[in-house]
Swiss-Prot record:
Subcellular location: Periplasm
Protein name per UniProt: Phosphate-binding protein PstS
GO biological process: phosphate ion transmembrane transport
Claim: Ribosomal protein is one of the keywords in the record: no
PANTHER family in the cross-refs: PHOSPHATE-BINDING PROTEIN PSTS
Gene3D superfamilies per record: Periplasmic binding protein-like II
Keywords of this entry: Periplasm, Phosphate transport, Signal, Transport
Organism name: Haemophilus influenzae (strain ATCC 51907 / DSM 11121 / KW20 / Rd)
Signal sequence residues: 1-19
Biological role stated in the UniProt entry: Part of the ABC transporter complex PstSACB involved in phosphate import.
Gene: pstS
Amino acid sequence: MKKKSYYVLTLGTLPFAQANSITGAGASFPYPIYAKWASLYEKETGNKVNYQSIGSGGGQQQIIAKTVDFGASDDPMKSELLQQHQLVQFPAVIGGIVPVVNLPEIKPGKLKLSGKLLAEIFLGKIKKWNDPDLVALNPTLPLPNKNIIVIHRSDGSGTTFGFTNYLSKISNDWKNQVGEGKSVKWLTGQGGKGNEGVASYVRQMKYSIGYVEYAYAKQNQLAWISLQNQAGQFVQPSNESFMAAASHAKWHEKAGMGVILTNETGEKSWPITAASFILLNKYSDNPETTKNVLAFFDWAFSRGQDAATELDYVPIPADVVSTIKSQWKTELKQ
């Protein structure tokens, strides 16, 4: 057997001697910030990062197959899978999954929903926008006598994992009939590929409802809902409400820091907050490429945080970043 030696990263390995290119693929949830980071990084260093938004399932498959330099997933891999496939996992950014609607005359944040009502809509039990339960919660809104058009993801998706994980915590009917996962058997609705596809469908189709990462909602000028959290408060998606949820995370208790941030406590917490994770092969066939990937994320953690905040993502806390960098030194090998 070939002897394995530790791949040691120090800050001294990070300066950029010459231009290089790395490739990544996976979650569409963080695509807006990864694209922004890649643009800023290339301007500053000359190094290129090519990231393809193909969904978390595809990102996991491609890093396992070693067809990309890094994978990205919003559905954190469990300890046994990380060990089985000899992968290293760490969080890169935090954001929010938001239900969005296309209802004429109803502006962002005005429609109130509880988690239970949201589940019943996606189960197909609530079929009309003027359903009595929706009207009771929104007595002043002009809810139309129109069928609700449900839009969900058609691909393996970490955004779907976060959304269905939340609904499984809120609704026993959802947990028993649909459950959670990157791909589930939907009981109603039609599918769009990627956050991009869901956002496009909701934008085009009146009386529809879907779920996307918050940056996609803003970029597509979609109306998000006000969602009731565990504390009983109706909150809107924002950098602050995502940060409130993330403040309760116990990063160091999970393998690969794979925390789930849905339905967190706190009066200001957004109920469907999620971290997005990077996956690297522990044993690299090309140590120089691994070094280049780490250089990019080292740059993102130290110089890309303002860009993350501008796009309404939450940067990874400094103490967690310190742990991540220690993890790079001890777990990545060649």
